[in-house]
């Protein structure tokens, strides 16, 4: 007994004419039970670093394990392709990357809900995907009913600032557009290349600037590497550990909130996620928070905890 896996395609109006010329037509991997029933939950995975839908990967193995234990009930679970040339996606609208928030909220959810007659919607993801799940849920509690944020970007000062000197050195005397084109063709990026692409990508989402040649501003001076506090201030407006206090009423509307983090997370996200948890707790937000032994990577099995939790809450 295993889940049905189907790949469908959706053509997005929200992504038309995106600055990166990334594909407008996207694949969505759909996991569905043998019997499809009305009003089942719709769960959407938001990938971390450029995850693309693949049949029979670790994610599908986890889902099939849960399905055989009857923990997925009648839920429809989808894994869309949200990849960008920056190798990251924060799932918000940006003229420097594309309108991914609109793509999800205005296109994917209505399309899938109509196709499978689903009801409550839940988002889940790790790292950037966890950030996206939180951010979309707190901004659209009328559409999103719950989310699972697995060690998502938070307390940005610990996550991103260590990568800024690396990015400065990686980009020194280089044209950023040429750099992006070169790295987009590589399958085996070095650690420094990944870190540089991460800062470039975050700049595209957090500090976009339509008047700039690149459509975004970096948080450091290109010639010296010195920090730019004015740009950084744009970034931290998106920091869940800081902005959560602005969304208390919206969070209270949600049916399910799941947070977790590894106590050895390489990006110190045990600080960010712990802070987010404490602020939710202080403000009376019902949620589940777990810490586990491990780091930031190779943690797909954490979905064995969050997905059944979301499905149970969103099936009520």
What are the language-model segments listed below?
Residues 1-316:
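Non-catalytic cap/lid and distal C-terminal segments of serine-dependent acyl enzymes
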